[in-house]
C-alpha cells in the first residue's frame, strides 16, 4: 500500500486557526517536520486545505500502523 510523506515547509505564524488545527491533525508540529501518513481521501483533503504550508509526495512504503494496531501489538 502507498503512503504519503508530508513535510511542513512554512511556519504557522499568521495562518488561520482552522489551518493550525489541520496541521496538528496531520501530526506536524514544527517547521521542517516530516510525517509518513496513509494514502486516504481524508489525508489528501487535509493536505489540500493547507497546501500552501506543506509539501507532499507519494512513496512506496508501508504507512505506520494505526493506534489500534499498536495497542494490540503492545498487549501481545
From Swiss-Prot:
Tell me which InterPro entries the record gives: Ribo_uL30_ferredoxin-like_sf, Ribosomal_uL30_bac-type, Ribosomal_uL30_ferredoxin-like
Q: What GO terms describe the biological role, i.e. biological process, of this protein?
A: translation
- List the Pfam families hit by this protein, alphabetically: Ribosomal_L30
Work out whether the entry's keyword set contains Ribonucleoprotein: yes
Family membership, please give it. Answer: Belongs to the universal ribosomal protein uL30 family.
Q: What is the species of this protein?
A: Anaeromyxobacter dehalogenans (strain 2CP-C)
Q: What is the lineage of its organism?
A: Bacteria, Pseudomonadati, Myxococcota, Myxococcia, Myxococcales
Assigned keywords, A-Z: Ribonucleoprotein, Ribosomal protein
Q: What's this protein's name?
A: Large ribosomal subunit protein uL30
Q: Per UniProt, what is the name of the gene that codes for the protein in this document?
A: rpmD
Q: Which GO terms describe its molecular function?
A: structural constituent of ribosome
The record's subunit annotation is: Part of the 50S ribosomal subunit.
List, alphabetically, the GO terms of the cellular component aspect.
large ribosomal subunit
